[in-house]
Amino acid sequence: MSITAQSVYRDTGNFFRNQFMTILLVSLLCAFITVVLGHVFSPSDAQLAQLNDGVPVSGSSGLFDLVQNMSPEQQQILLQASAASTFSGLIGNAILAGGVILIIQLVSAGQRVSALRAIGASAPILPKLFILIFLTTLLVQIGIMLVVVPGIIMAILLAPAPVMLVQDKMGVFASMRSSMRLTWANMRLVAPAVLSWLLAKTLLLLFASSFAALTPEIGAVLANTLSNLISAVLLIYLFRLYMLIRQ
């Protein structure tokens, strides 16, 4: 059977519309979890204020130079802030991926589904999803730091891995290997969707500061919710595509 991107886009749009409220609630809940965890593990406002003390920002030629000019205490605060942001984001993304994929599975099985039921049902696979998303994010970031293009290629090749991990109950590394093979053989169907996702995420990041006009916390929840909705659309597309390829 010939698979066209247009037919998968249409199926994705129909599913997203039919399950919009459930997906929205999952996205909102994951955004709230991300923001709360980030706030809990981040340094205090007083500690963050110390980052500006005695650091010659204007005289620094780059990020590494700026960090080197910091005191050991300031470097520790920066590391804690970065780790808190990364950890909370990974937790939120793992719950989102598990919740959305379980929504698709439950709906496909003809069962009634709610946001809490989907997230609860995904609990057993969340540890593996967390490790998978951590490794994927690490590889993509390393690739982007090198020449950008390798990072984008890794993002494309590993995009279906969460779907394969949950749907076929694979291990972390097995799902990564299978994802690379499947994507390489179907690059024309996977690459445009992932590139569109990356573009949408980038545009959202550019306008994220405007959400802070409300309050920083509410703005962060709204921005994360929109980001999660974008990721949910990609997950639905990849799940549908994977099911068609397997037939």
UniProtKB/Swiss-Prot annotation:
The chain crosses the membrane at residues 20-40, 87-107, 118-140, 152-172, 187-209, 225-245. Keywords: Cell inner membrane, Cell membrane, Membrane, Transmembrane, Transmembrane helix. GO terms for cellular component: plasma membrane. This is UPF0259 membrane protein YciC. It comes from the Bacteria. It comes from Shigella dysenteriae serotype 1 (strain Sd197). Belongs to the UPF0259 family. It is found in: Cell inner membrane. The lineage of its organism: Bacteria, Pseudomonadati, Pseudomonadota, Gammaproteobacteria, Enterobacterales. It holds the Pfam family UPF0259. It is a multi-pass membrane protein.
